[in-house]
């Protein structure tokens, strides 16, 4: 289970942000993971890396920049769908997208190619964002593979997605999006420190948005435990183990801020990372 909220605007007001993104990664606490960092094999990419045997090198959220633009990829599981026999690992969907800057890996071409081959994976939502010149609107797409669907979303609008189809959101996603919109409206031109603190507070929200018919259908056994933005299901050692905020300001300065568990206890120590990168020379 994961959630993501974002607003992508290629031409924000001075002092505003081209990208405001907040995301929780929900996973088993024991799953081996590298915290957000510049990637060793692609030094223009930033994000966490999955170390699970057989899934090494994949990621759930990453941002990459190149000459003239930057792009973001995020992957969310679609809960409650049957798993294909011999399903291919999904983590490389994001990694392949953000590491390559050629035309074949443009947001349009990459998604159209993925759409033709997406049923070999377990069910997912793939969010892709591409932001370049201020004269061109940000491009935002969401690809779901059950059923195979590719949708476009608008520059400058706030969106929230989770582990259901985009037009059947869980209650926590619906309410979270409303709160995210309020934060963007109130703090969308605030300092990185102020805006990121507000977004982290949203991601830590433990309120259970229950009952939820869609979540009850997709996860009948875990539904109530999964109904908060900040998930913690102690008996299964599962929950929101990583909170991420990614900001790119109007001058193309990127901030990747992450809080992630260092052990198996969500009440224990968390590792805090703040990566700053000036995309100006590349964008």
Curated annotation (Swiss-Prot):
UniProt-listed InterPro entries: TANGO2 (IPR008551)
Major location (coarse): cytoplasm
UniProt GO BP: Golgi organization; protein secretion
Cytoplasm among keywords: yes
Domain of life, per lineage: Eukaryota
Keyword Hydrolase: no
Localisation per UniProt entry: Cytoplasm; Mitochondrion; Golgi apparatus
Keywords carried by this UniProt record: Cytoplasm, Golgi apparatus, Mitochondrion
Family from the record: Belongs to the Tango2 family.
Name of the molecule in the record: Transport and Golgi organization protein 2
